[in-house]
C-alpha cells in the first residue's frame, strides 16, 4: 500500500509473526493487542491501516493471487443486533454491486468452527487512503483534482441510486482513494432502499453531512439526502474545512441557514409535520449568502453546481444524473461510461423478526459462498 507517489506515507508498523492454528489452515496475529485470525492464504506483513467503532483494518497480501487486500475485523459481531444487521447489509450490498467507483468485497473469511463464530473478517480491495486524510493533509488540491473526485463520486452514486439504494452515510472518510486518485464509495452499513420510508432509529450518519430533511426528522426522505452530502463534500474538498461543523442539531440547522438562507414557506412542502414547519419558521431568519463571495477560490462552475446541491427543499435539489450533466463536469462526463445497476437490490433479507442467530447463519452462508472449497 505505497501511496508515496501521490499522497505521502503513513509509516509502516507491521506484524509479521503469526501462530498457525486449526492444523495450519489459519494463522493468528497480534496487531497492537488485537487478535487477527485469518486464512493462511493471507500472509504478512499485516499492517494496521484503520480503526473505528467496529474494530480494526489491516493490510495483507493474498498469497494465491498476489493481490494486496484490506481485512476488516468486526469483533463480537453478533453481540448487538443493530450492528449485526449493519454488517450483513454491507456484505449483501457490496456483493451485489459491481462498479469501478464502489469498493469491492473479495472474501468473507470462513470461521474455523461454525459453533465459535463470533468475529467477522471482511476482505476488501486495498486502497491507499481516503478523502478525509487528503483534505487534512498538506497535499495541494487543484480544481482538476476536486472535479475528478466529484465526478467519480457522482458516477458511483448514479450506479448505487440505480440499484434502488440510498447510501445515507456519505462523508470524506467513506470515500477511498489510491495513488492514481481513483475514488471508490465505501461503508454501506447504513444503506437503505429508496422505498423504505420509516425514519431509522439507529441512524448515526455524521451530523455535518446530514440533509435538512433528516435533521428535521422527515420520515419520507429520498435520494436527495445523498446529494446534500455530496455538496458538503464538494465544499469541504475545495476549502479544506467542513462546511457545516454543527455541535448539535440546532447548531447544524443554523449553520445551514446562515449559508443558504432561511427557507420560505414554499420550500417547506416536504415537511409533513405541522410541528416541524412551525419549528423552522420560528428559527432566526438569515439571508442567503453570495456563494461566489463565500467561496472565492472555487471556479464559477463549481460554485454553480454547489448551489444546486445545497438546496433546502429536497424536491428542488439537483439529481445525480443532472449533476453529471452539469457544465462543470463536461470535461469528464460521458453517459456511455456511466453504467447503471442491471438489477435493483433487494433488502427482503432484513425481516423485523431477524435474531442475532439468524444473522449469524446468513453471514456464515456468505463465508461458504466465498470459500466453497473449505466446506465439507
UniProtKB/Swiss-Prot annotation:
Which controlled-vocabulary keywords does the entry list?
A: ATP-binding, Cytoplasm, Cytoskeleton, Immunity, Innate immunity, Kinase, Microtubule, Nucleotide-binding, Nucleus, Phosphoprotein, Plant defense, Serine/threonine-protein kinase, Stress response, Transferase
| Recorded GO MF terms | ATP binding; kinase activity; MAP kinase activity; protein kinase activity; protein serine kinase activity
Q: How does it assemble?
A: Interacts with MEKK1, MKK1, MKK2 and MKK6. May form a ternary complex composed of MEKK1 and MKK1/MKK2 and MPK4. Interacts with MKS1 and AP2C1. May form a ternary or larger complex with MKS1 and WRKY25 and/or WRKY33. Interacts with MAP65-1. No interactions with RACK1A, RACK1B or RACK1C. Interacts directly with ASR3 and mediates its phosphorylation. Binds to MEKK2. Interacts with PAT1. Binds to HT1.
Residue stretches making up the Protein kinase domain? 43-329
Residues found modified as Phosphotyrosine:
203
Q: Where is this motif: TXY?
A: 201-203
| Database matches in CDD domains | STKc_TEY_MAPK
Q: What does the entry list as the binding residues for ATP?
A: 49-57, 72
The record's annotation in Pfam families points to: Pkinase
Known catalytic reactions: L-seryl-[protein] + ATP = O-phospho-L-seryl-[protein] + ADP + H(+); L-threonyl-[protein] + ATP = O-phospho-L-threonyl-[protein] + ADP + H(+)
Q: What is this protein called?
A: Mitogen-activated protein kinase 4
Gene Ontology BP terms: cellular response to carbon dioxide; cortical microtubule organization; cytokinesis by cell plate formation; hyperosmotic response; hypotonic salinity response; innate immune response; jasmonic acid and ethylene-dependent systemic resistance; jasmonic acid and ethylene-dependent systemic resistance, jasmonic acid mediated signaling pathway
- Describe, from its UniProt entry, the tissues in which this protein is expressed: Ubiquitous. Expressed in the veins and stomatal guard cells of leaf plates, petioles, stem, roots and flowers.
Q: Where in the cell is it found?
A: Cytoplasm; Nucleus; Cytoplasm, Cytoskeleton
User: From which source organism is this entry?
Assistant: Arabidopsis thaliana
Output the Gene Ontology cellular-component terms: cell plate; cytoplasm; microtubule; nucleus
Enzyme Commission no: 2.7.11.24
Query: What is the reported phenotype of gene knockout?
Result: Dwarf plants with cytokinetic defects in leaf epidermal cells. Abnormally developed and branched root hairs. Retarded root growth with the protrusion of many epidermal cells from roots. Heavily bundled and disoriented cortical microtubules resistant to oryzalin. Exhibits a seedling-lethality phenotype. Defects in the formation of the cell plate. Abnormal mature pollen grains. Abolished CO(2)-mediated stomatal closure.
Protein family membership:
Belongs to the protein kinase superfamily. CMGC Ser/Thr protein kinase family. MAP kinase subfamily.
Q: Which InterPro entries match?
A: Kinase-like_dom_sf, MAP_kinase, MAP_kinase_CS, Prot_kinase_dom, Protein_kinase_ATP_BS, Ser/Thr_kinase_AS
User: Which residues are annotated as active site?
Assistant: 169 (proton acceptor)
Q: What is its main location?
A: cytoplasm
Query: Which purpose does this protein serve, as stated in its record?
Result: The ANPs-MKK6-MPK4 module is involved in the regulation of plant cytokinesis during meiosis and mitosis. Essential to promote the progression of cytokinesis and for cellularization (formation of the cell plate) during male-specific meiosis. Involved in cortical microtubules organization and stabilization by regulating the phosphorylation state of microtubule-associated proteins such as MAP65-1. Involved in root hair development process. Negative regulator of systemic acquired resistance (SAR) and salicylic acid- (SA) mediated defense response.
Amino acid at each position: 500500500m505505497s501511496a508515496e507517489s501521490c499522497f505521502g506515507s503513513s509509516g509502516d508498523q507491521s506484524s509479521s509473526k503469526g501462530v498457525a492454528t486449526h492444523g495450519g489452515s489459519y494463522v493468528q496475529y497480534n496487531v497492537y493487542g488485537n487478535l487477527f485470525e485469518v486464512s493462511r492464504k493471507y500472509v504478512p506483513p499485516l499492517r494496521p491501516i484503520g480503526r473505528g467503532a467496529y474494530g480494526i483494518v489491516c493490510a495483507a497480501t493474498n498469497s494465491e493471487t498476489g493481490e494486496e487486500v484490506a481485512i476488516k475485523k468486526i469483533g463480537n459481531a453478533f453481540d448487538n443486533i443493530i450492528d449485526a444487521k449493519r454488517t450483513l447489509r454491507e456484505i449483501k450490498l457490496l456483493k451485489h454491486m459491481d462498479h469501478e467507483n464502489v469498493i469491492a468485497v473479495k472474501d468473507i473469511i470462513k470461521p474455523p468452527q461454525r459453533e465459535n463464530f463470533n468475529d467477522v473478517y471482511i476482505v476488501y480491495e486495498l486502497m491507499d487512503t481516503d478523502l478525509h486524510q487528503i483534505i487534512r493533509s498538506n497535499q495541494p488540491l487543484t480544481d482538476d483534482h476536486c472535479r475528478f473526485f466529484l465526478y467519480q463520486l457522482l458516477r458511483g452514486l448514479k450506479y448505487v441510486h440505480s440499484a434502488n439504494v440510498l447510501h445515507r452515510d456519505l462523508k470524506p472518510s467513506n470515500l477511498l482513494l489510491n495513488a492514481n486518485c481513483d475514488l471508490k464509495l465505501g461503508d454501506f452499513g447504513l444503506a437503505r432502499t429508496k422505498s423504505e420510508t420509516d425514519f431509522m432509529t439507529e441512524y448515526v450518519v455524521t451530523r455535518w453531512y446530514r440533509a435538512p430533511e433528516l435533521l428535521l426528522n422527515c420520515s419520507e426522505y429520498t435520494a436527495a439526502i445523498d446529494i446534500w452530502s455530496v455538496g458538503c463534500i464538494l465544499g469541504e474538498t475545495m476549502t479544506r474545512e467542513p462546511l457545516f461543523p454543527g455541535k448539535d442539531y440546532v447548531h447544524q440547522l443554523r449553520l445551514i441557514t446562515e449559508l443558504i438562507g432561511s427557507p420560505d414557506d414554499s420550500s417547506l412542502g416536504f415537511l409533513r409535520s405541522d410541528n416541524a414547519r412551525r419549528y423552522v419558521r420560528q428559527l432566526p431568519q438569515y439571508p442567503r449568502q453570495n456563494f461566489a463571495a463565500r467561496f472565492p477560490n472555487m471556479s464559477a462552475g463549481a460554485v454553480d453546481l454547489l448551489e444546486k446541491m445545497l438546496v433546502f427543499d429536497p424536491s428542488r435539489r439537483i439529481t445525480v444524473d443532472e449533476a453529471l450533466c452539469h457544465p462543470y463536469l463536461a470535461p469528464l462526463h460521458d453517459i456511455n461510461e456511466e453504467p447503471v445497476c442491471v438489477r435493483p437490490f433487494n433488502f427482503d433479507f432484513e425481516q423485523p423478526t431477524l435474531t442475532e442467530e439468524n444473522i449469524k447463519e446468513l453471514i456464515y452462508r456468505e463465508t461458504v459462498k466465498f470459500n466453497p472449497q473449505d466446506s465439507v
